Amino acid sequence: MQALEWKDGLFYRDGSPALMISGEFHYFRVPKGDWRDRLRKWKAAGGNTVATYIPWLIHEPAEGEYSFGEHDYDDLEGFLRTCLEEGVQVVVRPGPYQYSELRYSGLPGWLCEGYPQLLARRLDGSVFGKSSISYMHPLFLEKAEKWIRKVCGLLAPWCAGRGGPIVAVQLDNEAVGIHTWFNDGWYDYNPDTFGFGNPDGRWPRFLREKYGTAEALSEAWECRVDSFADAAPLCQKAESRGGIRRLRDYEQCYLAQVSDYFALLRSWMTESGLDLPYIHNSPNPDANGDFFEIADRMGPRFLLGSDHYYNLNQNWKQNNPTPQYAVRNFISLETLRNLGVPPTVLEMPSGSASDWPPILPEDARAAYETRL
């Protein structure tokens, strides 16, 4: 097998344009005895690739105690071997985050419960999610690096360049969403991560590099700021041009730290032996623009895709695909084309965990055809 390749907005396989038709296959949820049969059914249906999360909480149930192959449900290498034997490509998603409706969004409970200082915060310092972690918190990076190096060292022999089935690796999962979804659309304001009040903190450094002087910052924000360390983010609707600039400044600072986070993840994975293209799934059709800086920084072997759901529960705006949904998808895919990558949907629904609203064949077909 060959690692995932693309150019001029198309995927290639063996030198010719090809589609990557991937289905989500969670080895930790499917009985091991059914793996081969399910893979064969997927190939018979036209699939050529499967993607799987590799949940941190399953493989490191206690801090420092790893389990790979101790049980049928955590036999990662057994799954990769079966995929190789069946000729199915694999996209691996080792995290640190997985989501996938797992407890703690796929992070270990010992991490989220045992180290509350890692949790993302509102501007007032309160916690808004029991599994919403502050990406660049030093202690989280220490724990995450150990996990990434452990799992990627195990994955390395299974990369396509070494004769294995793995053709790409995903960095984290739906970045930004773990904060905005649970903080009413706002970001993470963990003081240890962003260094509020610290002249050398991330946020004051960002402002210093952008404005140069407190006077220039005061003029832009249309309010008096005595020093960069004293400059506080705005976390409410802006009522003036200065307020809008203040909101935008924090958004840029926040997204820059996501870019730093991705760069760290990639360096750990590469140093652990993963010679593969890297991908990421923006959390919804409207979020691709948040990743422009990241895509530029990651370079030509980075593929940004998007997640397109029309319904996950009764609280969504629509129960079925709508014209508005189709327009959002079109704009999302055109954004990816403008980035020079194949317009790729990395998650879309083919079933539902809810009895109501049901996903019907007509709805599924309409949803899928909005990507054509």
Kindly give the residue locations of the regions a language model identified.
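Short, acidic/polar
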Residues: 28-44, 286-297, 364-371
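Catalytic-core region of carbohydrate-active enzymes that cleave or remodel glycosidic bonds
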Residues: 263-278, 292-372
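Hydrophobic faces of well-ordered beta-strands that scaffold small-molecule active sites
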Residues: 19-23, 50-52, 90-94, 167-171, ...
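N-terminal carbohydrate-binding accessory modules
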Residues: 1-49
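Aromatic-lined substrate-binding rim segments of carbohydrate-active enzymes
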Residues: 35-115, 156, 265-272
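Acidic (Asp/Glu)-rich catalytic clusters
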Residues: 39-46, 84-85, 159, 294-299, ...
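Polysaccharide-binding and catalytic clefts of secreted carbohydrate-active enzymes
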Residues: 112-301, 326
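Alpha-helical scaffolding within the catalytic cores
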Residues: 4-9, 33-38, 151, 286-295, ...
